[in-house]
UniProtKB/Swiss-Prot annotation:
Protein family (similarity comment): Belongs to the metallophosphoesterase superfamily. SLP family.
PANTHER family: SHEWANELLA-LIKE PROTEIN PHOSPHATASE 1
Protein name per UniProt: Shewanella-like protein phosphatase 1
Catalytic residue positions: H138
InterPro entries: Calcineurin-like_PHP_ApaH (IPR004843), Metallo-depent_PP-like (IPR029052), MPP_Shelphs (IPR041787)
Gene3D superfamilies, per the entry: 3.60.21.10
Transmembrane annotation, as ranges: none
Keyword annotations from UniProtKB, A to Z: Chloroplast, Hydrolase, Manganese, Metal-binding, Plastid, Protein phosphatase, Transit peptide
Tissue: Expressed in rosettes leaves, shoots and flowers (at protein level).
Uppermost EC category: hydrolase
Encoding gene (name): SLP1
Residues reported in the UniProt entry to bind Mn(2+) 2: D102, N137, H242, H314
Cofactor: Mn(2+)
């Protein structure tokens, strides 16, 4: 029944006003006859962004980062969008970068990574590009107050960041953008002042938990920052989400899901009419951020199960007008890969030192074609490319 209903759906134009990102004057597209044409602007629909038209842009997808700033930089440099001189400059020109969630937990530089992506987005827009994020299950868990997977040093970063905000007279935007350039010094200062007994300091740890709660509870400054991003994003005819989009999500409404998650994140919970955590997006094995339906190894499935998953995937893609879906969430021991006729791409390689500590890999998309970019196993500065149709 779900597939019949899905086949009757059309990807209707979003109702939200459009935002235009104008390419820089130097952004030119070379045609087959040697002429150069100016790129069309990027058009964003939805709040948070849900549907993006990025004509003739190169798209790069990066998987789960889990608080590892070093690996995040490696991945972004591998993607060709981050400078390698330590200045954290955007060098991707008009590239569109999409990070598919799970920046939080398991590492100690979470806010620094979020700050880096915001800084790169500002720089990218000036060059006709853009940076997008979708929230993962670890973002929604933290806004819910579930800190089970937080690295002890990440609590310290939250404490430092709250103290740092005082230097900016609570000017959030300026402080947040600059944290990537300041966080290293704060981290070094903290390390130099620590003693062996600090790890057993209950008061210090409690202070970190309180700082994290202040920042990430619904309505908190960092929760509001996360609310700028949805859990589902379509760029051209490519769909991005953390766990996986399913037929009942499409029937419920993609924009509606994004809007409800965003509203929940930015709304304080101390009111009777405060919005509840959107279950369809954030809770349960079949929610947008938790689903692993498309990420299981097909070798573990029976033929009839593979057929079922394949039908669910392609019905979903047809309903939203997408060629393929890109997901994170489940580390892929074989690296970035595709299944079901390359209708699904799995880009979480467990690169964070808090997960598998594997070498970064990224997915590059040009038009309807995608390829995996990975570093050479022996020499990091050499790149290997695996092409897919």
């Amino acid at each position: 029944m779900a597939s019949l209903y899905l086949n009757s759906l059309l990807p209707l134009p979003p109702s939200h006003p459009q935002k235009l990102l104008e390419p820089s004057s130097s952004s030119l597209l070379s045609t087959s006859n040697g002429n150069e044409l100016a790129l069309k602007p990027i058009v964003i629909n939805g709040d948070p962004p849900t549907f993006v038209s990025a004509p003739a842009r190169r798209i790069v997808a990066v998987g789960d980062l889990h608080g590892d700033l070093g690996k995040a930089r490696d991945a972004l440099q591998l993607a060709g969008v981050l400078s390698s001189d330590g200045r954290d400059q955007w060098v991707g020109q008009d590239t569109v970068l999409v990070q598919v969630g799970d920046i939080l937990d398991r590492g100690d530089d979470e806010i620094a990574i979020l700050s880096l992506l915001r800084s790169l987005d500002d720089q990218a827009k000036a060059n006709g590009g853009a940076v997008f994020q979708v929230n993962g299950n670890h973002e929604t868990m933290n806004v819910e107050g579930d800190f089970r997977y937080v690295d002890a040093r990440a609590f310290d970063e939250c404490t430092d960041f709250l103290d740092y905000l005082e230097d900016y007279a609570q000017d959030w935007d300026k402080a947040f953008r600059n944290w990537i350039f300041e966080s290293r010094q704060w981290k070094e200062d903290r390390r130099s002042s620590q003693t062996y007994w600090d790890q057993w300091n209950v008061v210090k740890r409690q202070k970190g938990v309180i700082a994290r709660s202040v920042l990430l509870r619904p309505g908190g400054r960092l929760a509001c920052e996360l609310s700028r991003h949805g859990v589902i994003l379509r760029v051209n005819n490519w769909l991005f989400c953390h766990g996986g989009l399913l037929p009942h999500h499409v029937a419920y409404g993609i924009e509606r899901i994004n809007r409800e998650v965003s509203t929940w994140m930015r709304s304080p919970t101390n009111y009777e009419d405060s919005p509840q955590m959107p279950f369809i997006a954030t809770r349960g094995y079949d929610s947008v951020v938790w689903s692993r339906l498309y990420s299981r190894e097909t070798s573990e499935l029976e033929d009839y199960q593979i057929e079922q998953v394949n039908k669910i995937l392609h019905d979903t893609l047809e309903a939203v007008g997408a060629k393929a879906m890109v997901v994170g969430h489940t580390p892929q021991l074989s690296g970035v890969n595709c299944e079901y006729g390359c209708g699904i791409w799995r880009v979480d390689v467990g690169m964070s030192s808090g997960v598998l500590d594997s070498r970064p890999e990224v997915l590059e998309i040009r038009g309807d074609k995608a390829r995996v970019i990975r570093s050479n196993r022996d020499r990091l500065h050499e790149l290997q490319v695996a092409d897919y149709i």
